[in-house]
Amino acid sequence: MRQRLPIKRSNLLSAIFRHLPGAWIDPKQNELIALYRLRYKMAMDEQKYDTAMIFLNKIIELEPMNLEAKLAKGEIYHRCLQNYPAAIEQYNKVIRLAAGREEDPAQLRARAAMAEIMEMLS
């Protein structure tokens, strides 16, 4: 039986970089966010809401203050899944994070969606 020789990971990576330049590109944060946004939109087009949520969570993981991603989560809960308590929670997060910026478009949309839910539930 053939014995495997131990290969150090750093040596292996060095060999790959040397023979295949550009084989590994470390994406920047804004590139990852753009990629996750694209994947989110694709998932929404296919009505795969759980997959869309995964990509929104990845965006929020990279940018915890991303109001658009939090608002999009609220809209999925509200309009697609009809999970109103979860939608209200997301909309409240957007409103709290945008406190002091009364004209912020995300905050205005969150307030309008909250009013719509409250009217529907009353």
Q: Locations of the language-model features?
A:
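Specific register positions within alpha-helical solenoid repeats of the TPR/Sel1-like families, i.e.
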Residues: 44, 78-79, 119
